[in-house]
């Protein structure tokens, strides 16, 4: 199997199986640090990659509401001279009927003002994303990188907001995996992260951190503006940013999306879905299940009513 060289600013590459026809695929990368004194990744990394591959290769994942691309295969990538690049390449099949580069939600909001979605389309985008997060959590999986650049649309120009998929699984892991890997400190990414997860994290990642990130993206969808442009966040501490996002939600969302949607977003940002749930008492799985029940009722339930609007 031969994978074409990467192209700048594109995740699309061509893979040619031995004796087969070339196929365009969407590629994501998962870097790894070789074990000390060796060229191979750690056993924990190998297990993590296999587990993620098993999840994303499930043919029924899309039908179940995951809205993730189907993983074709995983390669340990090498450069043109055969040297290991210390990263895995996840090769995803493109959706049927897709053509050309997908567009991210981030790009759609910032660079396509003439293609603003209808009110009903905004509700549908929000519902599809919230359903993706719900389904991932239902199988005990954490995404860890929910932000608008990791939501892609593969639809044709006249149906721009169709064929929506959640990508960006570089840091994703099983909820029982206690590894800590997402340690960059960039405001454009931090603004989607819970305050506890900005900079070197000192708390274990949980479903509530994913749900907080979802709330930030839902705020962007509702106002159809990039959250980074709301005001000058540079220099604010993480808790102050969180407070400002909550204030923007309360003050601005009701006019654009209504009270139910606003309350759904605030449930995500306020972490109230965990009220009455104590992980230590019933174990991690019991805690997740309790949060899932509240999420279905208060977040998905708050969004679904607007999908039929035009």
What residue ranges belong to the model's regions?
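Conserved structural core of kinase catalytic domains
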Residues: 69-121, 176-182, 187
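Activation segment/activation loop of eukaryotic-type protein kinase catalytic domains
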Residues: 147-196
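Protein kinase catalytic-loop region centered on the HRD/HxD motif
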Residues: 131-142
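ATP-binding glycine-rich phosphate-binding loop
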Residues: 1-33, 63-69, 78
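Conserved end of the kinase activation segment
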Residues: 196-208
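Helical subdomain adjoining the active site within ATP-dependent kinase catalytic cores
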Residues: 62-70, 75-78, 83, 145, ...
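Alpha-helical D-x4-[hydrophobic]G micro-motif in the C-lobe of protein kinase domains
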Residues: 210, 214-215
């Amino acid at each position: 199997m031969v994978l074409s060289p990467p192209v700048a600013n594109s995740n699309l590459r061509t893979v040619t199986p031995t004796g087969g026809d070339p196929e365009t695929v969407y590629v994501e990368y998962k870097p790894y640090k070789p074990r000390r004194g060796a060229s191979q990744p750690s056993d924990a990394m190998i297990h993590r990659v296999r587990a993620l591959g098993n999840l994303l290769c499930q043919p029924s994942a899309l039908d179940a509401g995951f809205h993730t691309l189907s993983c074709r295969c995983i390669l340990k990538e090498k450069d043109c001279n055969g040297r290991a690049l210390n990263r895995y390449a996840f090769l995803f099949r493109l959706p049927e009927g897709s053509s050309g580069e997908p567009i991210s939600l981030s790009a759609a909001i910032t660079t396509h003002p003439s293609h603003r979605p209808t009110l009903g389309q905004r509700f549908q985008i929000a519902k599809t994303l919230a359903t993706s997060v719900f389904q991932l959590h239902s199988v005990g999986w954490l995404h860890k990188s929910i932000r608008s650049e990791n939501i892609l649309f593969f639809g044709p120009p006249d149906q721009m907001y169709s064929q929506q998929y959640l990508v960006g699984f570089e840091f994703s892991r099983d909820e029982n995996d206690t590894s800590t890997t997402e340690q960059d400190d960039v405001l454009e990414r931090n603004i989607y992260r819970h305050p506890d997860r900005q900079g070197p994290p000192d708390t274990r990642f949980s479903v509530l951190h994913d749900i907080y990130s979802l709330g930030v993206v839902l705020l962007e969808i509702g106002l159809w503006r990039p959250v980074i442009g709301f005001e000058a966040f540079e220099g604010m501490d993480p808790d102050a940013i969180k407070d400002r996002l909550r204030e923007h939600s309360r003050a601005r969302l009701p006019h654009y999306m209504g009270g139910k949607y606003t309350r759904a977003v605030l449930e995500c940002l306020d972490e109230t879905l965990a009220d009455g749930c104590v992980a230590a008492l019933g174990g991690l799985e019991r805690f997740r299940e309790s949060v899932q029940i509240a999420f279905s009722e208060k977040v998905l339930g708050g969004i679904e009513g607007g999908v039929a609007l035009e």
